[in-house]
């Protein structure tokens, strides 16, 4: 099984006259494969949420038990993102991603035939563990095929797969219910999404690509000279082929202050995001006295406003900010701070909805920019490990702070305590955005010095 996940031998070299055309076609296929793959992971993750009313009614599970199941998946997913993303550095991205999808589908089929709570809990944990196999290959693929100047737009396109995947789960499950009927709720909730995921897994295998070299093409550094210096590291004397995934993680990520800075950016972004999304329904219903329909509209705006904002932010970070990601993240977090106060203090139904939509519009931008920054602070062969650290930190600490600690603050101090917590998280996020930006500028300066030194040596050799 493990041997199937390993990178295969390099393909025959593409003839020189076909390199440009092949390169352009392959990288579009690679991007589409990880977009579809990530989208499919959401189909076999978010379907669980849609099944919870039937779990409560048909299997007589309590709200506490359902909450425990959700927490199990969240924790397992956070741990898995850390471990699986590191392992992905040594694997074939398309095989790794497709394998994870198939395993998630198998688990969902198991959920469709389960009736005992503890069996459900075990399968939900397994689903969370296999879900972690989707993120690492996505970032590795983008880092392998797209230069720094394009990663903002490319990362933005890939990032909306989260929103699209989350958005099409309900129509898929709803159509299954319409065809099969509520008496077959387990098939509609679990088995149909599992079948859809398998179809997407096949598309990942067909469209997906390894690194350019594995596909018989020159590397990104050879195709685009400006990338050559970007990938240099002070540890470059040891070939990564001779290092295990753990050694790569320790050498290029664990000791890398910039990897920690960007991970803490994600921690506090997730804290604010989960604090808003987890508590928005109950806050609007009980404090702002929204109707269920009005709350649903506000929730819809919070989620879907992120798509145009993310695409615009990708273009701005590439073009206006010249590949520097954190200044835009700082601007977004500052605006979120202001809108959070408006969301909290406003009594107008319209204004509360508007402020919620703006927060939803902006909160995914720093998250996606942090993911792009991650690809630029480590060499391409360590991207999975860096993504793993970010994923572990964001889910285990960030999501927990936004859900559990927010609830504790509300119980102890009232709703204002929860909002003070989120405001503090925003301030901390801005601080780590600044530190991450400063670290990126230092790397940029080091790259320029290295480039100048190489040019000087080349000139000396020529003379």
What are these regions (language model features)?
Residues 48-52, 255-311, 367, 371, ...:
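Extracytoplasmic gate region of multi-pass secondary transporters
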Residues 60, 92, 113-118, 289, ...:
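Helix-breaking motifs and short loop linkers at transmembrane-helix boundaries and internal kinks
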Residues 79-118:
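Conserved MFS/SLC helix-loop-helix module at the cytosolic interface between two early adjacent transmembrane helices
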Residues 81-92, 310-322, 410:
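Helix-to-loop junctions at the C-terminal end of transmembrane segments
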Residues 90-101, 319-333:
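Cytoplasmic membrane-interface "Motif A"-like loop-to-helix N-cap segments
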Residues 123-161:
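Cytoplasmic helix-loop-helix junction between adjacent transmembrane helices
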Residues 158-212:
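Helix-loop-helix hairpin linking two adjacent transmembrane segments in secondary transporters
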Residues 323-370:
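C-terminal transmembrane helical hairpin of 12-TM major facilitator-type secondary transporters
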């Amino acid at each position: 099984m493990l041997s199937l996940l390993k990178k295969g031998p390099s393909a025959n070299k593409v003839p020189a006259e076909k390199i440009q055309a092949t390169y352009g076609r392959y990288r579009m296929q690679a991007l589409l494969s990880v977009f579809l793959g990530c989208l499919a992971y959401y189909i076999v993750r978010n379907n669980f949420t849609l099944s919870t009313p039937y779990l409560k009614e048909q299997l007589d599970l309590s709200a506490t038990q359902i909450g425990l199941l959700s927490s199990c998946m969240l924790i397992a997913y956070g741990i898995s993102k850390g471990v699986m993303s590191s392992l992905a550095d040594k694997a074939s991205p398309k095989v790794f991603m497709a394998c994870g999808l198939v395993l998630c589908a198998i688990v969902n089929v198991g959920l469709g035939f389960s009736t005992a709570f503890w069996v459900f809990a075990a399968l939900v944990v397994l689903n969370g563990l296999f879900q972690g196999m989707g993120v690492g290959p996505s970032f590795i693929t983008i880092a392998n095929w797209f230069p720094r100047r394009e990663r903002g737009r490319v990362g933005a396109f890939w990032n909306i797969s989260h929103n699209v995947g989350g958005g099409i789960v309900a129509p898929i499950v709803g159509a299954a219910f319409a065809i099969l009927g509520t008496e077959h709720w387990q098939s509609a909730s679990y088995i149909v999404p599992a079948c859809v995921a398998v179809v997407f897994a096949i598309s990942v295998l067909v469209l997906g690509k390894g690194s350019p070299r594995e596909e018989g093409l020159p590397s990104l550094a050879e195709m685009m000279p400006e990338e050559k210096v970007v990938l240099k590291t002070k540890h470059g004397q040891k070939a990564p082929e001779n290092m295990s995934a753990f050694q790569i993680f320790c050498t290029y990520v664990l000791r890398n202050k910039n990897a920690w800075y960007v991970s803490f950016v994600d921690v506090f972004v997730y804290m604010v995001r989960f604090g808003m999304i987890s508590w928005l329904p109950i806050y609007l219903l009980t404090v702002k006295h929204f109707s269920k329909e009005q709350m649903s509209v506000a929730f819809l705006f919070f989620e879907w406003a992120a798509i145009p904002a993310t695409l615009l932010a990708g273009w701005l970070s590439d073009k206006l900010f010249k590949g520097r990601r954190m200044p835009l993240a700082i601007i977004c977090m500052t605006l979120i701070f202001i809108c959070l106060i408006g969301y909290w203090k406003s009594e107008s139904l319209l204004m509360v909805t508007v402020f919620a939509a703006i927060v939803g519009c902006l909160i995914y931008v720093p998250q996606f920019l942090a993911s792009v920054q991650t690809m630029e602070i480590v060499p391409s062969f360590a991207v999975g490990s860096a993504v793993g650290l970010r994923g572990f930190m964001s889910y285990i600490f960030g999501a927990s702070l936004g859900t559990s600690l927010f609830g504790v603050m509300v119980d102890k101090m009232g709703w204002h305590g929860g909002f003070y917590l989120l405001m503090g998280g925003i301030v901390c996020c801005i601080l780590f955005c600044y530190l991450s930006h400063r670290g990126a500028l230092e790397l940029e300066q080091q790259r320029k010095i290295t480039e100048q030194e190489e040019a000087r040596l080349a000139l000396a050799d020529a003379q």
